[in-house]
Amino acid sequence: MRPALSDYQHVASGKVREIYRVDDEHLLLVASDRISAYDYVLDSTIPDKGRVLTAMSAFFFGLVDAPNHLAGPPDDPRIPDEVLGRALVVRRLEMLPVECVARGYLTGSGLLDYQATGKVCGIALPPGLVEASRFATPLFTPATKAALGDHDENISFDRVVEMVGALRANQLRDRTLQTYVQAADHALTRGIIIADTKFEFGIDRHGNLLLADEIFTPDSSRYWPADDYRAGVVQTSFDKQFVRSWLTGSESGWDRGSDRPPPPLPEHIVEATRARYINAYERISELKFDDWIGPGA
């Protein structure tokens, strides 16, 4: 259920976020406690998740050099009290139709592509790589931006050129990889591996390319504890993979290949997911989540 904000017109709903109009140039981006997996929005919610996503994005927007869509601080007076801590005022952009994915390690859909073709998004890789193999240099592996309920599809860089032009495609690749490396280097100093991440970009009215939506959250990134890292096995994680793994495990009783939606998450999975998200934020930022603004769960 989305918050009814009397001062702002509701514009759109995503899997996790609600978007409201502030004025002709600005939007209010509100992160809910919803969680999605395998193209479904689950019936369960994760308490405080929207606040963690907002805190994490705000931290990384301040850390990385890439220009972004923020138009005010997390305590901007334009943010209503009822969504304080889970909302940001952002610039209205023309969003580009590409999910910009940076991969430092082989896992997830990238691993499936590699096992089937020896490539990821058209990039040929050496033989013998395994789950969680580290790449010598990070890869730019874009994907289509699917509608709600559809699957994102990994695409080649040449396809990105066809979609947005060569100049913009090169900007997207360079900005994605530079931003990933900057954040991943920071995370390693905190004992965290950012295995991969995805970004969205938009164009402002002056033609500038801006980083948008969320960045380096446990929803959009894979976080692994560096001390436990070992190639060849599925890694312990502080991200949404924990929920995906439960859904496809025997305890859930759910068949991913069926037409049935996933079951609700049991309380112990909800609590463990909340703890993992908060742990990721506190380790990366060296800040206490209890000090983050806004009403908690």
From Swiss-Prot:
The EC number of this protein is 6.3.2.6
> Tell me, which GO biological process terms does this entry list?
'de novo' IMP biosynthetic process
Give the superkingdom in one word: Bacteria
GO MF terms listed in the record are: ATP binding; phosphoribosylaminoimidazolesuccinocarboxamide synthase activity
**Pathway where this protein functions:** Purine metabolism; IMP biosynthesis via de novo pathway; 5-amino-1-(5-phospho-D-ribosyl)imidazole-4-carboxamide from 5-amino-1-(5-phospho-D-ribosyl)imidazole-4-carboxylate: step 1/2
Q: Name one GO cellular component term.
A: cytoplasm
Which Gene3D superfamilies does the UniProt entry name for this protein? ATP-grasp fold, B domain, Phosphorylase Kinase, domain 1
Q: Which UniProt keywords apply?
A: ATP-binding, Ligase, Nucleotide-binding, Purine biosynthesis
Q: Which Pfam families match?
A: SAICAR_synt (PF01259)
The record lists the catalysed reaction(s) as: 5-amino-1-(5-phospho-D-ribosyl)imidazole-4-carboxylate + L-aspartate + ATP = (2S)-2-[5-amino-1-(5-phospho-beta-D-ribosyl)imidazole-4-carboxamido]succinate + ADP + phosphate + 2 H(+)
- Family per UniProt? Belongs to the SAICAR synthetase family.
- PANTHER family from the UniProt entry: PHOSPHORIBOSYLAMINOIMIDAZOLE-SUCCINOCARBOXAMIDE SYNTHASE
Q: Which NCBIfam families match?
A: PRK13961.1, purC
Protein name per UniProt = Phosphoribosylaminoimidazole-succinocarboxamide synthase
Which lineage do the record's taxonomy fields give for this organism? Answer: Bacteria, Bacillati, Actinomycetota, Actinomycetes, Mycobacteriales
